[in-house]
C-alpha cells in the first residue's frame, strides 16, 4: 500500500492499527500491519448510516435540501447519512449525553439536543424555541477554549438550552433556523432502543410538515412484551414479526399518518435481530 493510499484511508477513518487510526499525524511503528475496513462500513460514523441509506434507496426518497429531525440520534449514523445525501440541516435529539460523533458535533448543519425525552409532547419544539429565544447571551456564557464534550465536570450538569451548542464550534440555532422557525420538519427519521416507537410517535408526528416523510427503523424486540422476546433479546417467531407490523401500522394510523411501505432493513441489528423500516407521510 502506497503512502497516498494510507493517507486517504486514515483521513476517512477506515484504517485500523489495534484501534481506529483517526489522524494522518498518528505515529505508528515501522512494522505496523494496516488493516482496511470495508469501505461501505467506513462511510458513516456508525452502521446506522448504511441501514438508512439502504432504506432510502429502496424507497426512492430524496432528502436533498430538507430540514430533518433525527430521533434517537446517538452516535449519529442516521444524521451522517442524511447530510451525505444532501440534507440542508439536521436536528438531533437523544435522551443520552455525549454520544454524538465529534465529526457531526462540529458540523454547522447539525444541532444536537441532548438529555431530551422525545416521548414528552412538545419537548423538542420547546427546546428549539428556548434556544432561539435565549441565544443572545450564548456567546458570553461559552468559553471557546474549553472542551465541553471531554470535560468530566459537566457530565452531571442539568440540561439547559445554553449547553446544547458545542463549545468548540459555538454553533448557534440561528445558523440553522430562521427566528420564526415553527419546529416542523420535511423529514423525520429515527432509531430508538429500549422503548416502543408507538410511545414516541404521538410527540413527533405533529412535528412533520404536511406531505413530509417519516422513515423510522423498527426494532421488534422493543415493540413486543417482555415475555415474547427470546433468550438474548432475539425475536424468532414469524408470527411475532407480523404482530409488530400490525401494531406499529395501527399506531401510525391513529396519528393521522399514511403508511406507504414496510420493508426489511438491508442490514440486521448488531445482535442478529431482523429489523424493519416504516415509511409514512402526513
Task: List each model region and its residues.
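S4-like RNA-binding module at protein N-termini
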Residues: 2-62
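Conserved class I S-adenosyl-L-methionine
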Residues: 64-74
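Conserved SAM-binding loop of SAM-dependent methyltransferases across substrates and taxa
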Residues: 75-86
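Short beta-strand element of Class I
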Residues: 88-91
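S-adenosyl-L-methionine
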Residues: 93, 97-183, 192
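A short glycine-rich, Lys/Arg-flanked "PGG" loop and its adjoining helix->strand segment in the class I
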Residues: 198-213
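Short, glycine-/aromatic-enriched active-site segment of Class I SAM-dependent methyltransferases
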Residues: 220-237
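Core SAM-dependent methyltransferase catalytic element
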Residues: 267-282
